[in-house]
């Protein structure tokens, strides 16, 4: 395992630990999720270029588009929560409420 792969896996695991530890605020959770997606994007790009699987060259771009949509949805939820409640506590989310 090269040092680049080790650093990327460490970045992913640190972002995952951040999601699990700092889940009280939505903004910190969204930042950790974005870090996870970016490390996955870089790992997927390196994997495709290392094994010369150029038939999968669109996969990192699709992952990047999905992560951008996820970030936009998360920011929209953050703005809606801050307008309604005045804070970004995840405990204010009630998924059963319309």
Swiss-Prot record:
Coiled coil: none annotated. It is found in: Mitochondrion inner membrane. Pfam families: Oxidored_q2. One of its GO terms (molecular function) is NADH dehydrogenase (ubiquinone) activity. The chain crosses the membrane at residues 1-21, 28-48, 59-79. Its EC number is 7.1.1.2. It catalyses: a ubiquinone + NADH + 5 H(+)(in) = a ubiquinol + NAD(+) + 4 H(+)(out). GO terms for biological process: ATP synthesis coupled electron transport. GO terms for cellular component: mitochondrial inner membrane; respiratory chain complex I. PANTHER family: NADH-UBIQUINONE OXIDOREDUCTASE CHAIN 4L, NADH-UBIQUINONE OXIDOREDUCTASE SUBUNIT ND4L. Belongs to the complex I subunit 4L family. Core subunit of respiratory chain NADH dehydrogenase (Complex I) which is composed of 45 different subunits. This is NADH-ubiquinone oxidoreductase chain 4L. It comes from Phascolarctos cinereus (Koala). The lineage of its organism: Eukaryota, Metazoa, Chordata, Craniata, Vertebrata. The gene is MT-ND4L.
């Amino acid at each position: 395992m090269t040092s680049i792969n080790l650093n990327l896996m460490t970045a992913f695991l640190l972002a995952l630990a951040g999601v699990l530890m700092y889940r009280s605020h939505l903004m910190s959770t969204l930042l950790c999720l974005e870090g996870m997606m970016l490390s996955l994007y870089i790992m997927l790009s390196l994997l495709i270029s290392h094994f010369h699987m150029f038939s999968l060259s669109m996969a990192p771009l699709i992952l990047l588009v999905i992560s951008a949509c996820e970030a936009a949805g998360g920011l929209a939820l953050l703005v809606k929560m801050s307008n309604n409640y005045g804070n970004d506590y995840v405990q204010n989310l009630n998924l059963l409420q319309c």
